Every structure is written in C-alpha cells, then in structure tokens.
Amino acid sequence: ALVLSVQQLLCGCSATELEDRCFPMMAVVDEKDGQISFGYGFPKLSQKDNTDLEEARVNIAPVTGKTMESCVQTYDSRLEKLADCNHMKVLVFGENLMEDTGRYADVLSYLKQTGLFPRNIYVCVAEDPLALFETEEDLPQDLGSYLEQYLQNQESAGSGKLFKLGRLLDEKENHILQIMLPYLETEDHIIFWKNMYRVPDDRFLYKQEK
C-alpha cells in the first residue's frame, strides 16, 4: 500500500519537484546465494524535463534480501532522491532467478500487487544482468533506453516477439499463452539477442534456439 501511495503521489508532482527525484530507466532482478538481488540503472542526463541538467547519478550497487519487497525498501533507503519509475524502459530478470521458480513467482506477485513498475516496459532475461552494465560506457545513451531501442529494432528484424510486463503479470494467472522472453548475452562488451526463453506454465524455464 505504501508503494502504491508513493507512485500515486509521483504522478501528481509538479515540474518544480523534479530535482527531488531520480529516474531509473531499467531494473535488474536476479537470485544470488539464495536471496533476491535487485538494482536500478539510471541515465547520465535528465531526460524528463527537456533540459540538459545532470541527474544526481546514484552509483549504488544492487542489494540483496529475502524478498523483493525488502530489496526495494533497502535500495530506496540508500538513494538520496525518490525513485520515480514512471519512465522506466526495461526489466531484466537473471537466469538464476528464472530457474528458482518459487522466488520468480514471488517477484511477479509483488510487482502485480504494488504496481511498482509501468506495465508497458519490456521484459527480458540475461544470464548475468549486471554484465549488461559493463557495456554502458560504449553506448550513446543510458543502458535502459538503449535496450528499449535495441529490442524494438531486433523485433522489427524478425528476432522474436517482445513481451511487456503487464502482459506477463496477467499471464501468470491466465496460463493461456506460452511466454517467450528475449535472452540477452554479452560478448566483447556488445549486447546480443540470439535466443528466446519460453515459460510454458511458470513451473519451469528453458532456453530455445531461434
């Protein structure tokens, strides 16, 4: 309920309050040593108010915790500004999390109950989501925005169909569609989408070659 209240307040904020917020462009969620690992990816420059003012770049390492809720609370407590997720582009799940079906289901339940992230963001899987950040220095924009454009371009080129968070959360309950998520890999600091992950019924996950 607290998260929902914060999100509702953010929607009503005036432009003068932008300086009190930071804007994650992506989020990564994985499983590490039996716990949830969570973190945000931030832009280098403000992209929300048509100015070139530098964001307060928050270089906070991902945090771990027993639940997604505890991770979000811990991460937010370390930020100097309030995280406004309304402009987020991409959510990346780690392969370890996807193989831990219990925790994966718990994460989806938390996201559905809280509405923490926009329903229209793209969802993909990576063996090591943190490795994606190692490519950011060579990118023309922040990693989240880059991934959004890259995924859209690859979909247009026939690499596969993209899946948005809202649809994923709905299918968790409907169990109608065979869920296919882009699988991202890195090689020589370059990101590739070569494979798809299929989640038939949320009970197991495996990688399928194109």
Per-range role (PLM):
Residues 2-210:
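Membrane-proximal alpha-helical signals and transmembrane carboxylates
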